[in-house]
């Protein structure tokens, strides 16, 4: 599986530890799709921040956020629908940078 496929798989499973392991030590996740559900943009720096935030997010949600309609445009770009609380949000995920050892350096999630 590509990194982006693994990311979506971890999100679907609600596995914050495996999700964090996809990121480099200082990897960045920038997710502005949360604004479509009335929340602040999520900007996380570092795999520990990713693990801690999604431990909280999955716990508060009662499990993973449903993801459907995934379409990979290319290896580093995917479109999908994600449900935050009661809001269905169409997003594009763009893996903009990967480290030499194959970890996510920067992943941007944007609402469409």
Explain the meaning of each model-derived region.
Residues 1-15:
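Short, aromatic-enriched amphipathic alpha-helices that serve as compact interaction elements
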Residues 55-112:
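A beta-strand edge to alpha-helix "cap/lid" segment located at domain peripheries
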């Amino acid at each position: 599986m590509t990194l982006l496929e693994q990311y979506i798989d971890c999100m679907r499973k609600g596995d914050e530890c495996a999700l964090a392991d996809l990121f480099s030590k200082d990897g960045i996740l920038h997710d502005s799709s949360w604004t479509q559900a009335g929340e602040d943009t999520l900007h996380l720096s570092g795999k520990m921040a990713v693990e801690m935030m999604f431990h909280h997010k999955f716990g508060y949600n009662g499990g993973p956020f449903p993801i459907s309609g995934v379409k990979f445009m290319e290896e580093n770009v995917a479109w999908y629908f994600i449900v935050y609380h009661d809001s269905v949000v169409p997003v594009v995920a763009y893996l903009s940078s990967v480290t030499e050892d194959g970890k996510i350096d920067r992943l941007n999630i944007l609402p469409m």
